[in-house]
Amino acid sequence: MTTTIESTSHSERLSCMEVWGGNNETDAVIDRPGVTCRVRSRAYGSAGGGGDVYFLSSCASGRLTRFLLADVCGHGESAAETAIGLRDLMRRNVNRIRQKQLVQSVNRELAAADMSGRFATALVGTWMSSTARMTLSNAGHPTPLLYRAATQTWSECVTHETTTVGMQNMPLGIDSRVSYSEFAIKLKPGDLLLCYTDALSESV
């Protein structure tokens, strides 16, 4: 996600309250107020859809944009079933103001669903255009990378704050009692937030 982008990828239009995405191959650019999102996904081999799923939604005013990037345990039909479940869960919870509540609700409902023990690592982000802040929650997912245009440097996007004791930030769907933290970063013009699954690191 960045404030500026040049790409030959096809553009998508996001309707208000729509949850866009899935686990199919795509190379799309979506412009939202204050931020541009590029989503690129390719399944392994000849598979039509993989275990990596992506979703993007926006409030009616466009001030708030949310994304969920997940790596589902399993492939093929099992991953597709879980992807559909995650999409429905995100649609039901997209209006929650606090991101931690959204993540915890999705986790509880996924853990309670009959998914045969399947789970997913996930990264959830909420972009507020009025403050230029991105709030992130990480559920056992690879750490995103942050590029600062002003200094032309990359760094891991992590927080060192401690939260409450107990099970924290585990993959979604393992245990309904897990709590999730969140932290915010301010993005400036030209900054880039790179979010990915372990498929990227494994292919390098």
What is each of the regions a protein language model found here?
Residues 75-83:
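Conserved long alpha-helical elements within nucleotide-processing catalytic cores of c-di-GMP signaling
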Residues 1-68, 73, 90-204:
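Conserved subregion of the PPM/PP2C metallophosphatase catalytic domain
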